[in-house]
Amino acid sequence: MKKIKEAEQRKLRRKKRIKDKIGRGVASRPRITVFKSNRYFYAQVIDDSKGHTIASISTIEKSLNLGKNIDDVKKLGEVLAKRLKEKNINNLIFDRNGYKYHGLIASFATSLREFGINI
């Protein structure tokens, strides 16, 4: 039990360190944050000055019919990039939310970059 609490505390410290470095998202450059559960992958674009979610996407959406593997997360990045282009948002601050920049997180960010979003 002690190891679990220590791991959780390390993750919270990592999240705080990352947030302190990247700053807050504003309307001209909102923050995109990601979350991984055991079954799904979520991402949302947040304007921290207003406290509003501008856009969100996840593999749980029935219309997308995606799973939680690297290829599906790349498709998720493509769909989100198209949604952001419709709203004229091209610049984002990427918040990896304490996760390592590896695997799903890295492929999602790369997919956004490939479709014209500056991170």
Curated annotation (Swiss-Prot):
Residues 1-20 are annotated as: Disordered. One of its GO terms (biological process) is translation. GO terms for cellular component: cytosolic large ribosomal subunit. Keywords: Ribonucleoprotein, Ribosomal protein, RNA-binding, rRNA-binding. One of its GO terms (molecular function) is structural constituent of ribosome. Residues 1-10 have a biased composition (Basic and acidic residues). It holds the Pfam family Ribosomal_L18p. The keyword Ribonucleoprotein applies. This is one of the proteins that bind and probably mediate the attachment of the 5S RNA into the large ribosomal subunit, where it forms part of the central protuberance. NCBIfam families: L18_bact. HAMAP family: Ribosomal_uL18_B. Belongs to the universal ribosomal protein uL18 family. This is Large ribosomal subunit protein uL18. The gene is rplR.
